[in-house]
Amino acid sequence: ISELSPNFCEIYNQAYIAEQTNLMQICGTGYRKSLEFLIKDYLISITPEDQHETIRNKFLNNCIRDNISNINIKTVASRAVWLGNDETHYTRKWEDKDINDLKSIIELTLHWIESEIRTQKLLEDMPEFR
């Protein structure tokens, strides 16, 4: 993941530091921002170069809806955005969820992205039965 999205790693780690120093009003915003970099960097890595600028400028929800085909990534990333948005907006929609739920869903999103990348590499290395 650090190769795919170094900005994700940096932003996530800064959000974690904010959380550890009890800056609870800003750490969620950082986690939400890190998610945006993770998703967009992932999409940029799998799309043709002529689409990169479109992805950079598109709203995150639209990127997930329009550009992610893997149902697992799409499903968990959407929910991570929902919780991340609760950290940035005045009114929470998911009052029974907190920062730990957001981090857990980001971790799950990471898992599915890593699995897809590793599977793709395996299929490239072993395209067919011999």
Regions found by a protein language model. Give the residues of each.
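Amphipathic, well-ordered alpha-helical segments in soluble domains
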Residues: 11, 30, 34-37, 79-83, ...
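Alpha-helix C-capping/helix-to-loop hinge sites
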Residues: 18, 41, 67, 87-94
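Amphipathic, non-membrane alpha-helical segments in soluble helical-bundle scaffolds
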Residues: 1-5, 20, 24-28, 70-77, ...
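Short, hydrophobic, well-ordered secondary-structure elements
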Residues: 15-16, 23-42
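Charge-enriched, short contiguous segments at helix-coil
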Residues: 75-130
